[in-house]
């Protein structure tokens, strides 16, 4: 009897799907946060969770198995030196998928996938007090005064030209 496979096909052949997941995983390990479609993000989450769990073993055999899936030395180095240390006490759930607004061009469902322990809240900039309304640039007296001076000098130049003609 035929059984249904749980993985998404993503509209690709098997080799293309494998390469796509490997590339998305590499970028996630290097940059800790990537934006992609929701379906790709969910599949990448499955793929990366298994890789990180395997890497927590820390053996040479684990490195070789992971290198067969992700063929990028910088990503593997980052995984074993940095990421495994941060997630050592965590039992799964290394990534999070956050849904975003649909993409403008084709309305595809978008999402951000990120490593959980790397998402620090950005430090907020110090709050500045608003300037007094009279000091704001829009429609200020300074710009109006400057344009009046230019008009006066232009009319004075015309008057001088008229007197020279006489």
From Swiss-Prot:
Subunit and partners: Part of the 50S ribosomal subunit. Contacts protein L32.
Keyword terms: Ribonucleoprotein, Ribosomal protein
Protein name, per record: Large ribosomal subunit protein bL17
One Pfam family per UniProt: Ribosomal_L17
GO biological process: one example: translation
Biased composition (Low complexity): 152-166
Region (Disordered): 122-166
GO MF terms, alphabetically ordered: structural constituent of ribosome
One Gene Ontology cellular component: cytosolic large ribosomal subunit
Keyword Oxidoreductase: no
Cross-referenced SUPFAM superfamilies: Prokaryotic ribosomal protein L17
InterPro entries, alphabetized: Ribosomal_bL17, Ribosomal_bL17_CS, Ribosomal_bL17_sf
UniProt entry tagged with the keyword Plastid: no
Family label: Belongs to the bacterial ribosomal protein bL17 family.
Lineage: superkingdom: Bacteria
Composition bias type Basic and acidic residues, residue spans: 142-151
């Amino acid at each position: 009897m035929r059984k249904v496979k749980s993985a998404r096909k993503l509209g690709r052949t098997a080799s293309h799907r494998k390469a796509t997941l490997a590339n998305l995983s590499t970028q996630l390990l290097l940059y800790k946060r990537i934006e992609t479609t929701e379906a790709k993000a969910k599949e990448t989450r499955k793929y990366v969770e298994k890789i990180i769990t395997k890497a927590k073993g820390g053996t040479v055999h684990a490195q070789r198995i992971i290198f067969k899936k992700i063929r990028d030395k910088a990503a593997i180095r980052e995984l074993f030196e940095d990421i495994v240390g941060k997630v050592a006490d965590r039992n799964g759930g290394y990534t999070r998928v956050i849904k975003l607004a649909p993409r403008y061009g084709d309305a595809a469902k978008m999402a951000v996938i990120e490593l959980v322990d790397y998402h620090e809240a950005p430090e907020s900039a110090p709050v500045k007090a608003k300037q007094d309304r009279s000091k704001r640039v829009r429609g200020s007296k300074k710009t109006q005064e400057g344009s009046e001076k230019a008009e006066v000098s232009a009319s004075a130049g015309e008057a001088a030209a008229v007197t020279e003609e006489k």
